[in-house]
Amino acid sequence: NQTEIKMMFDDKNLYVGIKVPAKSNNFIIPSLRRDFRASGNDNITLLFDTFNDGSNAFFFGTNPAGVKREALLSGGGTDLRGFNLAWDTKWVCKTQILDDAYIAEIAIPLTAFKFREGETKWRFNSYQFDTQDNEQNTWMNIPQNQYIFSLAYMGEMIFEKPLGKSRAPIAIIPYINTFSGNDFENNSSVNDVKFGGDAKFAIGNSMNLDVTINPDFSQVEVDQQITNLTRFEISLPERRQFFIENSDLFGDFGNSRDGNPFFSRRIGIAKNKNGESIENGIVAGARLSGKLNNNLRLGILSVQTEEDIANEIPATNNSVVAIQQKLFSRSNISFLFINKQATKDYNFLTREDKYNRVIGIDYNLASANNTWNGRYFIHKSFSPTVNRKDIS
């Protein structure tokens, strides 16, 4: 028996009905946590390449218990690095377990996607893990030497009428945070009110302008606790919403392990005069990112952090410009410029800490059928004390 997937859409939502046959209702569901790992349990995943570029896709999945997983997929699905599971959006998924199958009914708001106005075709694929038959099934055939989520092998999804605009033009999320405390030992009290907010503006159908003022990240999901017994830093995923969308445009340069020039998690953290990492508040930030056309992507980011004189931390501006041009069927060439610079000349600043800049070019190779893929890059760092050999 084959898995059945049927779709409908209106001006607001994409509706998906799925029936997954099975030998019995003895499904393996090891976790009810959102964004669960697909391997080793029963589940089905849908991939939508809304710009038909074979490089980026939206990813939605569920298991027989109705647990949801969604992600942004970049880099053409050539490796696991392209998954961004920190991205979340609102959508509905209900499931029912039968004796010989499970059924899923899904409604995804069209505002969750980005696409060109008037679009009539997306690229689509789905894959399913079946533990009872120990199988991995896909709608479009994918060679066994490729990842099951490869965007090189996708079918066409045709809409009966052209789609409208992909996003609401403006989204504003304000916040206010109050704090009150008493120090009975010193007979004093502390009262504090903090306010700020985030705003997202749609520019056309494929560009976003994100703005943040005095951001409050208290609602961000807590990081997984890891005991680090090595002398090396742990690289934890970015979970702050301001930095997530199109994050691959800024952070997918160099080598993810030892040659990545920009890691957004460092913004908002600084070392005090004792060399300890502490929180460094963000005053404001702006971020423009998306597609200028089907072949050219642009990202501009600027974030200002506050000064902390007591801990000898300067006010710093963090700026990034990234440009990505598509080449051939699925390859691209990217340009990156990073500038981190103290906004004033502080007495406690050493010469090497006044600024640091990086300029770089990356070429990401991905053939049409993903037989050939690779990465070539050269990056150069500039600071007051850097010599000519600081190249990666």
What are these regions (language model features)?
Residues 123, 205, 319-340, 351-378:
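Transmembrane beta-barrel wall of Gram-negative outer-membrane proteins
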Residues 1-326, 331-335:
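Structural preference for beta-rich elements and adjacent junctions enriched in aromatics
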Residues 185, 348-351:
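A generic structural signal for short
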Residues 217, 341, 382:
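Feature marks short, surface-exposed loop/turn motifs that line or immediately flank catalytic pockets
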Residues 310, 345-349:
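Solvent-exposed loop segments that connect transmembrane elements
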Residues 281-283, 289, 354-356, 367-392:
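Exposed, low-structure sequence patches enriched in small/polar residues
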